[in-house]
Amino acid sequence: SPPSQDFMRF
């Protein structure tokens, strides 16, 4: 699964 901070990189 991707990092928890990566999903807010949009």
From Swiss-Prot:
Keywords: Amidation, Neuropeptide, Secreted
Domain of life of the source: Eukaryota
GO biological process assignments: neuropeptide signaling pathway
GO CC annotation terms, alphabetical: extracellular region
Cystines in this chain: none
Phenylalanine amide PTM positions: 10
Locations listed in the record: Secreted
Family: Belongs to the FARP (FMRFamide related peptide) family.
Protein name: FMRFamide-3
